Structures are given as C-alpha cells and as structure tokens.
C-alpha cells in the first residue's frame, strides 16, 4: 500500500478519521464549515479538516494525479479556504459582540488579510508558514454597545485569527502564522488602515518590503 510506505502522517490521519476515506477520491478540496455558534469547536474542526485534505493531496501525488505545481497550488488553496472561513466566522462573532466598524460616512469597514510569500505566490508546501498582513479600509468605530475603534477591533480579530490557525491543541495545529512582514515588523501595529499602509511605503518602506508585495 503506497500511502503506508510514503506517509505516516496520512496513515495516522486515516486511522483517526476512518469515516473520511472517501475524501481521498474527491477531485477537489472539500469546503470547510465551522459549527454555528460554537467557537470552542472551531480549532478542532479546522485541524481535522486540514489533516484530511492534506492526506488527500498526498494520495493524489502518490498516484500521479497531480504534478508538483498542482500539489503546491492545492496546498495554497487549502490555506486560502481555511483563512476565508476563519475570517468569516470571526467577523460574525465580532459583529455580535462589538457591532460593525463604520467610517465617518456610515460605511461598514471589513477586515482584510493580505497573503504574502509562498501563500501569495500559490507555492505553499506542508511545512510553510503563512505570511499575513492585516489591514482595513478606513478609520472608524464599531456601532455595538461595547464599542471599539477600528484599529483595536481589527487588531483583536487578527489576534484571534492567528490563534485559531496556529495554537497547538490535542488535534495539533493548522498553520503557523507569521506577521513580521507588516510595516515596522514586530514593533509595528498589528492592523493598519489602507491610508496608514500607503504612507508607510511612501516614506519608510524599504525596497525589499515593496518587492515582497509583488506576490500579495
């Protein structure tokens, strides 16, 4: 059995999720859907989903259904799906707790996560970090009873996103999130408005930082 010889990870995953063997034969990555209203279940659901979809990619590679480029693209797509669903449920959670952030004209402002590096280039492998930069369109405040200014709101959401993706649980972790490519690196603010980001790159950004955004 080629899979048993090639990947202990894949075999362990199939032993842990025996009802999911059919996933190996699926032509595309299965959607990720978190339990409604149960945030405590999200980390486990994300990690089990990632393990099973990773086993599927390994299976397809071993059986020569996909070449290296297709496999890297699938791994990157898997991360995109995980990030998209995570941002969706966290946006709903924060809206319920703090309301929605609106600018001076009453327009709703949304969380934006830019994928850089191998994620931005569609070249992730199974051991890659996920390089993210957090932003939001314009300054504002949330309209809930527990109001937050836009920067605090989206900073907290970004922190929760990194925890959901990267914290180690009994199911392992899903992705290591690297936020060091943001303006000013580790000393910089976690989430910036578009205007603040533009100002940084026009005044203080270094050439290599601008080049990194080619793959965003």
Residue ranges and their predicted role:
Residues 1-216:
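A nucleotide- and high-energy phosphate-metabolite-utilizing enzyme signature
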């Amino acid at each position: 059995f080629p899979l048993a010889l090639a990947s202990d990870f894949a075999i362990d995953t199939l032993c842990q999720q025996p009802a999911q063997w059919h996933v190996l034969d699926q032509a595309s990555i299965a959607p990720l859907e978190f339990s409604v209203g149960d945030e405590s279940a999200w980390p486990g659901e994300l990690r089990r989903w990632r393990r099973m979809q990773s086993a599927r990619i390994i299976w397809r590679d071993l059986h020569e259904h996909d070449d290296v480029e297709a496999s890297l693209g699938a791994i990157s797509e898997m991360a995109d799906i995980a990030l998209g669903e995570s941002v969706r449920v966290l946006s709903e959670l924060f809206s319920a707790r703090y309301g929605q952030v609106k600018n001076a004209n009453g327009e709703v402002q949304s969380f934006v996560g830019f994928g850089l590096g191998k994620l931005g280039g569609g070249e992730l492998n199974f051991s890659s970090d996920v390089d993210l930069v957090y932003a939001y369109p314009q300054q504002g405040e949330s309209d809930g009873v527990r109001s937050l200014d836009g920067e605090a709101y989206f900073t907290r959401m970004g922190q929760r996103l990194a925890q959901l993706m990267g914290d180690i649980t009994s199911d392992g972790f899903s992705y290591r999130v690297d936020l060091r490519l943001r303006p000013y690196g580790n000393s910089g603010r976690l989430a910036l408005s578009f205007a603040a980001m533009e100002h940084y790159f026009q005044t203080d950004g270094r050439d290599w930082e601008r080049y990194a955004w080619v793959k965003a």
